Amino acid sequence: MCIRDRICDYQAYRQEVEIPQIKSDPFESCKTQNPHFSMGIFMRMLYSCLVDADFLETESFMKNNHVERTSGEEMASLLARLERHIGSWLENDDLNSINGRRTEILKACLIAGENDRGLFHLTVPTGGGKTIASLAFALKHAVRHQMEHIIYVIPYTSIIEQNAQVFREILGQDNVLENHCNVDYGDSEELKPMQLASENWDKPVIVTTNVQFFESLFASRSSKCRKIHNIANSVVIFDEAQMLPLEYLKPCIAMMENLMDFYRTSIVLCTATQPALDSIFDQHRRYIELCPNINEQFKFFKRVIYENLGIIEFDTLIERLKTEKRALCIVNTKKCAQQLYEQLSGDGVYHLSTSMYPKHRKKILAQIKERMSDKSKSCVLISTSCLLYTSPSPRDCS
């Protein structure tokens, strides 16, 4: 018996499915500098739809239609949640206060959410309320254009954990998906919907890393590609956009432009130090700055005086830190951070590292916040992330 005799006849679909005839070239009117790249992305999007549909149908069949997935609330509902959260803030119009300045930026972002889809910059100085302002813009923009997802792309997992917690407090636990290498939803029945959503990003707000985002778009594995069709019709916010890796910048920018041109996506480059990306984007592409009166904001929020300590010995750094009542010391390596902590170890001295489990880091941060609330107590933190006494540190993993 030949193999053809053992294959079932599936031609019955011809009576069940009517496939419309394509009368014109769907790409004929598309103008792009790199048509081959654009066609490649289109094929990947189709593949993503196919793979996700196949997984979902198989899952439904195997579980007899008892699927544990929940997609979360509509964007309009999430916007209402945010508006309730920030309602009292909007009454503050005192531009001589920090909160008044934050309100000015927040209001501008809410108004800008009514703009057409496209490229946006949010250049906000440290302390200007960038996280909430960007969320306000994204929700307003998503409701205005009936967009389905808001995707935060962030280089550091430590920042992701903090931002995701803020979003959950405002929007609710079930509406925010945190997706990176440090997240393990395990076998918990309570977290099962999140574990399933991490496979295809079927949640209204997704917080992930640069690596996870771009690897999914360029990957050759079905498990990675499965989620990318849900990037279409989304607001994608690149927090700390200056951290996009230089060696991969051109393909990353090309992907952003393709998402904006063909997949109803808006891009927000969000940072306290806007990188010079304008020359890399298409010269005809214009962007809208979301932050009002940028120069004034940076002058107002300038609360740090930088001092170059030069090259100093390890023991000198220890002695300097011992004289500080409150300090954050960031070093290059986990080993160096551990050595400093051991030398300084005592009441009010803390250590943070990406070697710790996320729950452990959160516990330490909670202890630090509690101690900082008492101004009479000293607090010194040795860390491998970045703020003061800093040396260049590597980016976190995906």
Pin down the residues of each PLM region.
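Interdomain hinge/linker at the junction between the two RecA-like core domains of SF2 helicases
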Residues: 274-320
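Conserved strand-helix element at the start of the C-terminal RecA-like helicase core
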Residues: 159, 324-343
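Conserved Walker A/P-loop ATP-binding site and its immediately adjacent core
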Residues: 149-169
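Single conserved hydrophobic/aromatic residue that forms the stacking wall/gate
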Residues: 1-3, 389-398
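Accessory nucleic-acid engagement/destabilization modules that flank
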Residues: 4-81
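Inter-Walker segment of RecA-like/P-loop motor cores
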Residues: 175-215
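Conserved motor-coupling elements within RecA-like helicase/translocase cores
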Residues: 190-203, 358-380
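Post-DEXD/H (motif II) to motif III coupling segment of the RecA-like Helicase ATP-binding lobe
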Residues: 244-294
